[in-house]
Amino acid sequence: MTEEEWEEINQQEEDPYTILRKTTTASELAQKAMDKTKKTFEQMVPEEYRRHARTFNEKESQRFPLERPWDHAIELLPDTPKSFDCKIYPMTAGEDDSLREFIREQLEKGYIQPSKSPYASPFFFIKKKDGKLRLVQDYRKLNSLTVKNQYPLPLIPELIDKLRNATLFMKLDIRWGYNNVRIKEGDQEKGAFKTNLGLYEPCVMFFGLTNSPSTFQTMMDTIFQDLMATGEVVIYMDDILIATPNNTPHH
């Protein structure tokens, strides 16, 4: 599930737990179809690029992000109550095991920490295309009390127009997406979420926070502004597209 799909679900009035449960079967069928067409690293990556394999290594990317100017701030409206609570969603036995594993891994990486926050948002799991479970926080209550960040996302028609002279394309995706951005120091407790095993707060961005897309786009625009100025690199959220008229500038 993409950030955009989750943001759309998060705006609906129906319980997102119910909505996402309805999509499980479709996701499983889609994953089965994808599994039939999986290719090896050598099949997917041209030989001249294989020396960069370490750059895309999953373990190499699991590190706590540095403090940056674009750290995600959660600014609450002046009339926000001093506390709010939530219910706990029921879990299956498999989800309970996944929760314990998730908490262990996230604590080890520093992505979450135990919390004593007066705020508590609910959470549940959804099944990803690869069959694994992903934690999802239901931040609708918090989002309704958050000052909105109006930083714009790129307009799709403008991005497409920049590709008009390109003949060679390469698409890159940022691993772990939102987890590459810290929560601003002092704002972690505002994003606290209640689990069946306790209360925790995020130290990095997760799905569902209302201003996450704007924060992430700010980071990407800042880091890649020089490359984007050439017109041969276009970026939308965690998707990077290198588009050139021939091989020379592409390499």
Where do the protein language model's features map onto the residues?
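Acidic, serine/threonine- and proline/glycine-rich intrinsically disordered low-complexity regions
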Residues: 1-32, 173
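Reverse-transcribing Pol proteins
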Residues: 20-151, 231-247
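Reverse-transcriptase-like RNA-dependent polymerase core
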Residues: 54-84, 126-134, 151, 163, ...
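Well-ordered alpha-helical segments embedded in enzymatic catalytic cores
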Residues: 98, 155-158, 218-222
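Generic hydrophobic, aliphatic-rich segments that mediate packing or membrane embedding
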Residues: 102, 119, 152-155, 168, ...
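Structured helix-beta-strand junction loops
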Residues: 109, 165-166
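Conserved pre-catalytic core of RNA-dependent polymerases
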Residues: 114-116, 166-167, 174-175
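Polymerase palm active-site segment centered on the conserved acidic dipeptide of motif C
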Residues: 168-171, 245-251
